[in-house]
Amino acid sequence: MVTIKDIAKLANVSHTTVSRALNNSPYIKEHTKKKILELAEQLNYTPNVNAKSLAMQKSHTIGLFFTSITNGTSHSFFADTIKGVNQAISEDYNLYVRGIDDLKNYDSVTPMRYDGIILMSQSDIDNSFIYHIREKNIPLVVLNRDIDDRTITNILSNDKEGSQEAVEYFIQSGHQDIAIIEGIEGFKSSQQRKEGYLSALIQHHIPIKHEYSVKGQYDMESGFQAMERLLALPNPPTAVFCSNDDMAIGAMNAIFAKGLRVPDDISVIGFDDIGFSQYITPRLSTVKRPVEKISVLGAQKLLSLISEPETKAEKILENTEFMVRDSVRRLTT
């Protein structure tokens, strides 16, 4: 492996001069810099990131933490988040991904290990993790969950508005008996989506039936089980809003298992717009949440914060988009 000392020997300069030239120092004459850069290219020189990190007191690592990777995080949500962050971080950074619930303690989360952290937060149980990061003065951006600390850059989607729009679509299609399969209890996304559901019913003077609210776990199995409970009611709903697409797919399978059809017998709307949602039969109407866009923006904001620590914190709310497909039946003509 070619080192700085090898280049220095061939260029007949000190290794300090080579190091400065490779880092585009203004203190190195242009002709010397050009000679060194040409030699580095000819020799296929690759910087030793670990050595550079020690010298600059930087880890060149970005931490991407989820509340949990195994509980309540769908494959598509996980993939879109990583894809978005990877689009934004430069080749100078490594990405380390972990679930907070996998950590025994926070001792390993230090400025020496992470230049900055992106937290894809799903619950206020993350607050102790946020406090730790702040205490260690590690640059931080929080995604997905609305937080009260206005000194932290916070980026999320308007889930309440998105779910309200979905339920209003049911109402405009003539549905009155509308149920909800909720997400994981304690998750902010679950709360926001239920609030949107309730707001739509209240604004349109539709009675709220508590038996139409069934809890799920953001997975297909819980969606299936929740739908079975709704179908067992004396007066089953004609429409069901599911707090994510995985549960919507599970709910549709429960409907099919009873010999019923979507949307002829029961209409279904999901949330997230996972890639699979437009390839099932019928194609699932759903609320598209801009997870990848939020992740790209979060990584960009973190890089700005790393380079300019005095960057002002901001709260950014991204809009959702309702995707009309084939899973809702119109009862009114």
UniProtKB/Swiss-Prot annotation:
InterPro entries, per database record: HTH_LacI (IPR000843), LacI/GalR-like_sensor (IPR046335), Lambda_DNA-bd_dom_sf (IPR010982), Peripla_BP_I (IPR028082)
Superkingdom of this protein's organism: Bacteria
Gene Ontology terms: biological process: regulation of DNA-templated transcription
Induction statement: Induced by galacturonate, repressed by glucose.
Keyword annotations of the record: DNA-binding, Repressor, Transcription, Transcription regulation
Residues annotated as domain HTH lacI-type: 2-56
Keyword Transcription: yes
Disrupted-gene phenotype: Cells lacking this gene express the exu locus genes (required for hexuronate utilization) constitutively. Its absence additionally confers the ability to grow on minimal medium plus glucuronate, which cells cannot do in the presence of ExuR.
Record SMART domains: HTH_LACI
Any one Gene Ontology molecular-function term assigned to this protein's record: DNA-binding transcription factor activity
Classification via Pfam families: LacI, Peripla_BP_3
PROSITE patterns tied to this protein: HTH_LACI_1, HTH_LACI_2
Function recorded in the entry: Transcriptional repressor for the exu locus which is required for galacturonate utilization.
Protein name: Probable HTH-type transcriptional repressor ExuR
Organism: Bacillus subtilis (strain 168)
Gene: exuR
